[in-house]
């Protein structure tokens, strides 16, 4: 589960965050303001301060928030002076926007608020449609509304060029005041409530937020244009309501609820992608007529409410199609407020003790949860409080009166906090609503069965009883000074919350050592907080919009024992997971050594049994080799035997019946090259390849009845294959990694003659073994650093283990295996044809494609009939329209064309007789493997420097470049063998979003933008990891590049049509090269290694028995004089999607090459 934070505000207006992986409340970095309430999203938090103004807190990130400003310079040609700024009266402005309708001079473009800053001055954009323009960046046309070209023609009467300038948001990790317009008529009233949500509205662009606010006069306001590149938004717009609103809540999706002064609830209807503000309000009556609704909180599919009598209610039947729900259900507990966060998890603040409670047991099937559980963690400042007094406090608690005098010397007391308060200024009374329920704090964490369990240790009970008996009933300052006060009494001291009393600056007469310790700095600066070290924080507001808690996950928020102060809690001894792992490893190592000692003395004895044989049998299904191909029931037997030399080998027998005749098929497992699960939504099947089966493109396919049976057979057969080839443990640093279209990860150990120039090993004989996990892209280098990217753009780093997934037990390492999840989308298309009577309908011609189909139209795919890719995936969303398809869409998601096989566009013309719309649905997979998440930036591409085997990389870090899912180019710092995840990202500025990046062995960095243009980064070195500037490289004629891969000296690129290109003319003095040369077509992915070896994934490869899509291929004949090679060697195939050979720097040893030459020359051709 990724780390996220819970936001909360205490009664003194201080904002805290609590991490899902932490155990302490951390005070917000910017503590200059006091807040009433906050509303959090993943990337930011909005809040209302004590001045009733709205503030925004944007969390820091390695990727800056940048916005590009554009202005166009327009000129017209005249016979006297050529092109000039003197235009016709009917022309556009000399300086305008892209449409020409808005006057936009360079000096008239200002920053929207003080929270922005300019990155640089204005400069000309010399990129036009992916191609570099001439010097000056001018583009030409016959007239301004016409189509522009890079080349000047005889009829080019006008020209224009684009000026760009970037501004950067600078107010991060601080509260920035949202600016308001100066016009009093447009200035909204002071706010008293706000809510942030809407980031998961169906079909909405990623990064857009809906910010709703309520003013003191009961008006509802909506903040326009709030998004990731514009976190502040642009302006406030008034939303009409049927009454005065007191509070509003916006869920992550399209649920928006508000409460009225009269106690009813308002529900916003018609919220969608094109209308995030909705259309109208619907009224929902409160649960009872006596007590109206005073607070409401909306989630994805739930709504929680609190009535005026503090009762908690759950709204049943709420969803996007019925946002009003059906009925109210009363829940247990009394709260002042509740908040629904991500995954419909719920938090609340209790009326009795002002503690934050978490609703446990909330799942998609039980949205109301089961019980409330108090979050009992302390604050960050409490660590030093408890640490400075834990030893003496333990002595005073467990050894009686003998050390209580000395224990008091270092124990923090309320006097110290009072002294700090007096030095700060006048006393600060608590809010009135906290006075009624907060006089006694000792029962707040131990009352009720829904809070954390009470302790029952005799020593703790004795200490608690003794502290109760000796606690004097005096004022707060008197307690701290009294000689009978002990550290054990601090948690149960009565605190007068109504009027905190001042105390003199003079230290207590009986405790001279306390003042001395305090002057030495043993007490932290957190002592000026309004709470004592062991006081229970009093909360006023909580927001879980940025807290992602998955159902069934384990949190550390409830591990502190209730009824004990943080100081006493430090006494409990616990064994951390790291200590447990070290302890287990030590015992395992000792047992292994003892076993070796016991066996060494008996190795000279003859074995009683010369060889052992064991057999495993079972029932499976086999995809038969003959026509008609179908699944047939078979019996399988795996026979494993141990030879005289101790080596193990195995044979797999498949027994089947043909025309009542029993036959069998056998496979030697030492000949098997790969065992791969097959993507099938109906069968638990896997394929078995041998070199002969690889050349035929016809593997042995077997299917099990259940997923567990398939995993058992797959793990057993894989283990047997590894034992036959003596392949065990983690892959070597030079291993070759690959990923299938299913997301399965495979690795192969390269032999020395794999990249030999003569008598090289055919790549169809390479052995591939599966690693646990699920990825879409993988990248490795020869120093053992391996990174991967999932389908949801999450970055993962290899931990050094092996196995995971279905390979548990003997086929998996005992450590470095972690849970991994991935999310991908399934797409189907809705097709319609136009007719003159009814317009576009789902009735097509008999020759048309299915009205609900896949992207090709050849396979019928309906919403009800479409299933996840395999049985391991589960749906996590409903069907929604995908607006991000190539070619663009209209507001409803439709694409138009003259006929179905033609090209589609996002607007309707007179010749468009068909249209289609893409629907998507997300599904999720949970597995395990040797991978750890690299948060928080999501990536679309990654590249690691391919180092040669003789390169010494001990003096510098591993160079790693990546492209985020938003198109930002990043450089990872601090990557090494010991720290493969690195430390931080360094942003590399670009003028447009990028799609692919690759770094070569000599630090040459090439990249491809989303418009298909190529770029080279200059001056990249270990001392200057980000380089200095980009050089625009012309793309191949009429082609748009999609991927680039750089080796030691070679640069290869791939275009959108599957053509592979080689960059010729690259020299050390001219690293940009001179031209592109075509190498091959039918290529899906390319990977160039440190030896300039070229490996690709081919789209289609025809075998003797079948056709495989997605095949691993190696370029033959690559050498310095022939860098493009001469042909292809076809390897494993049928479903492969990505490969990385950038770690394979293994060369043939020189003595081996000389031995081959000594054997004799090859065949001579006359």
From Swiss-Prot:
TECPR repeats: from-to residues: 209-240, 254-285, 301-332, 344-376, 734-761, 958-989, 1003-1034, 1049-1080, 1092-1132
Biased composition (Basic and acidic residues): 466-481
Signal sequence extent: none
Comp. bias intervals (Polar residues): 407-416, 451-462
GO terms classed as biological process: autophagosome maturation; autophagy; macroautophagy; regulation of autophagosome maturation
SUPFAM superfamilies: PH domain-like (SSF50729)
Source organism, top-level taxon: Eukaryota
Molecular function terms, GO-annotated: phosphatidylinositol-3-phosphate binding
Residues that bear Phosphoserine: 386, 388, 391, 413, 418, 943
PANTHER family, A to Z: DYSFERLIN-RELATED, TECTONIN BETA-PROPELLER REPEAT-CONTAINING PROTEIN 1
Annotated domain remarks: The PH domain mediates the binding to phosphatidylinositol-3-phosphate (PtdIns(3)P).
Protein name in UniProt: Tectonin beta-propeller repeat-containing protein 1
Name of the coding gene: Tecpr1
């Amino acid at each position: 589960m990724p780390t996220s934070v819970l936001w909360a505000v205490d009664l003194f207006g201080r904002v805290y965050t609590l991490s899902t992986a932490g155990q302490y409340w951390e005070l917000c970095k910017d503590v200059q303001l006091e807040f009433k309430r906050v509303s959090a999203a993943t990337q930011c938090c909005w809040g209302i301060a004590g001045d009733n103004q709205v503030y925004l807190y944007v969390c820091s990130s390695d990727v800056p928030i940048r916005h590009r400003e554009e202005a166009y310079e327009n000129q017209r040609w005249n016979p006297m002076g050529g092109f000039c700024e003197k235009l016709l009266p009917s022309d556009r402005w000399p300086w305008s926007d892209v449409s020409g309708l808005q006057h936009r001079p360079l000096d008239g473009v200002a920053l929207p608020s003080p929270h922005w800053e300019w990155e640089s001055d204005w400069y000309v954009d010399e990129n036009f449609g992916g191609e570099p323009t001439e010097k000056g960046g001018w583009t030409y046309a016959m007239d301004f509304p016409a189509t522009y070209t890079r080349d000047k023609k005889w009829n080019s009467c006008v020209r224009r060029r684009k000026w760009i300038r970037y501004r950067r948001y600078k107010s991060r990790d601080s509260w920035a005041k949202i600016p308001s317009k100066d016009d009093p008529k447009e200035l909204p009233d002071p706010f008293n409530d706000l809510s942030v949500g809407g980031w998961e509205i169906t079909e909405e662009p990623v990064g857009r937020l809906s910010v709703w606010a309520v003013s003191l006069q009961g008006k509802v306001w909506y903040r326009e244009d709030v998004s990731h590149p514009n976190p502040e938004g642009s302006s406030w717009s008034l939303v009409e309501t049927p009454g005065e609103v007191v509070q509003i809540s916006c869920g992550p999706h399209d649920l928006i609820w508000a409460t009225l002064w009269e106690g009813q609830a308002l529900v916003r209807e018609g919220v969608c992608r094109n209308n995030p503000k909705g259309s109208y309000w619907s009224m929902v009556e409160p649960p009872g007529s006596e007590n109206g609704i005073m607070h409401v909180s909306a989630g994805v599919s739930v709504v929680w409410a609190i009535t005026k009598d503090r009762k908690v209610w759950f709204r049943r039947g709420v969803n996007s199609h019925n946002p009003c729900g059906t009925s109210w259900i009363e829940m247990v507990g009394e709260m002042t407020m509740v908040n629904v966060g991500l995954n419909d998890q719920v938090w609340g603040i209790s009326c009795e003790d002002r503690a934050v409670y978490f609703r446990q047991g909330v799942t998609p099937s039980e949205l109301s949860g089961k019980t409330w559980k108090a979050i009992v963690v302390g604050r960050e400042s409490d660590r030093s409080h408890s640490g400075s007094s834990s030893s003496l406090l333990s002595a005073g608690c467990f050894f009686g009166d003998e050390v209580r005098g000395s224990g008091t010397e270092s124990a923090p007391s309320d006097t110290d906090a009072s002294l700090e308060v007096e030095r700060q200024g006048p006393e600060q009374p608590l809010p009135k609503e906290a006075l009624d329920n907060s006089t006694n704090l000792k029962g707040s964490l131990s009352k009720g069965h829904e809070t954390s369990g009470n302790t029952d240790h005799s020593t703790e009970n004795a200490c608690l009883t003794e502290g109760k008996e000796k606690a004097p009933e005096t004022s707060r300052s008197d307690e701290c000074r009294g000689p009978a006060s002990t550290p054990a009494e601090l948690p149960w001291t009565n605190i007068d919350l109504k009027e905190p009393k001042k105390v003199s600056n003079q230290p207590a007469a009986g405790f001279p050592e306390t003042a001395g310790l305090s002057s030495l700095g043993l007490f932290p600066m957190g002592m000026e907080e309004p709470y004592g070290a062991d006081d229970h924080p009093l909360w006023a507001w909580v927001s879980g919009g940025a807290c992602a808690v998955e159902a069934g996950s384990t949190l550390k928020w409830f591990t502190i024992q209730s009824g004990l102060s943080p100081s006493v809690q430090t006494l409990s001894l616990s064994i951390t997971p790291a200590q447990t792992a070290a302890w287990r490893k030590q015992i395992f190592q000792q047992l292994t050594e003892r076993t070796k000692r016991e066996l060494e003395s008996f190795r000279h004895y003859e074995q009683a049994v010369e060889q052992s044989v064991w057999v495993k049998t079972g029932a499976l299904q086999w995809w038969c080799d003959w026509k008609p191909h179908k699944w047939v029931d078979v019996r399988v037997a795996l026979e494993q035997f141990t030879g005289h030399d101790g080596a193990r080998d195995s044979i797999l027998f498949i027994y089947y019946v043909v025309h009542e005749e029993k036959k069998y098929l056998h496979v030697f497992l030492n000949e098997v090259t790969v065992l791969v699960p097959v993507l099938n939504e109906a069968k638990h099947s896997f394929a078995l390849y041998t070199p002969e089966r690889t050349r035929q493109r016809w593997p042995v396919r077997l299917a099990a009845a259940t997923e567990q049976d398939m995993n058992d057979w797959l793990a057993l057969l894989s283990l047997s294959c590894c034992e036959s080839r003596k392949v065990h443990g983690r892959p070597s640093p030079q291993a070759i990694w690959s990923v299938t279209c299913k997301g399965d990860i495979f690795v192969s150990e390269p032999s020395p003659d794999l990249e030999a120039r003569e008598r090289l090993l055919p790549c169809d004989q390479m052995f591939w073994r599966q690693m646990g996990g699920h990825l879409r892209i993988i990248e490795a280098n020869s120093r053992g650093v391996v990174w991967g990217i999932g389908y949801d753009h999450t970055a993962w780093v290899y931990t050094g283990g092996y196995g995971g997934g279905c390979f548990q037990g003997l086929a998996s390492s005992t450590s470095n295996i972690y849970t991994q999840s991935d999310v991908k989308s399934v797409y189907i298309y809705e097709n319609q044809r136009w007719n003159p009577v009814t317009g576009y309908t789902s009735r097509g011609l008999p020759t048309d494609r299915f009205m609900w189909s896949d992207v090709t139209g050849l396979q019928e795919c309906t919403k009800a009939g479409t299933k996840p890719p395999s049985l391991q995936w589960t749906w996590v969303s409903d069907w929604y329209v995908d607006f991000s398809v190539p070619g663009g869409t209209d507001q409803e998601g439709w694409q138009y064309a003259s006929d179905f096989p033609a090209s589609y566009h996002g607007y309707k013309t007179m010749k468009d007789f068909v249209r289609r719309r893409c629907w998507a649905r997300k599904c999720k997979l949970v597995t395990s493997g040797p991978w750890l998440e690299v948060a928080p930036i999501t990536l679309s591409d990654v590249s690691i420097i391919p180092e040669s085997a003789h390169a010494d990389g001990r003096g510098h870090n591993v160079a790693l470049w990546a492209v985020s899912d938003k198109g930002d180019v990043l450089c990872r710092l601090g990557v090494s063998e010991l720290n493969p995840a690195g430390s931080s990202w360094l942003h590399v500025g670009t003028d447009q979003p990028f799609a692919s990046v690759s770094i070569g062995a000599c630090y040459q960095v090439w990249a491809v933008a989303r418009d298909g243009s190529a770029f080279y980064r200059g001056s990249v070195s270990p001392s200057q990891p980000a380089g200095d500037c980009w050089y625009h490289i012309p793309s191949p004629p009429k082609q748009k590049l999609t991927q680039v891969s750089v080796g030691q000296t070679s640069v290869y690129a791939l275009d959108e049509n599957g053509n592979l290109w080689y960059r010729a003319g690259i020299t050390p003095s001219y690293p940009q090269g001179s031209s592109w040369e075509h190498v091959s077509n039918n290529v899906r992915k390319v990977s160039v290694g440190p030896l300039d070896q070229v490996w690709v994934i081919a789209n289609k490869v025809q075998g003797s028995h079948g056709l495989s899509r997605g095949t691993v291929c190696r370029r033959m004949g690559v050498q310095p004089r022939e860098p493009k090679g001469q042909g292809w060697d076809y390897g494993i195939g049928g479903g492969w999607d990505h490969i990385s050979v950038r770690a394979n720097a293994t060369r043939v040893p020189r003595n081996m090459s000389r031995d081959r030459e000594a054997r004799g020359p090859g065949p001579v051709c006359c």
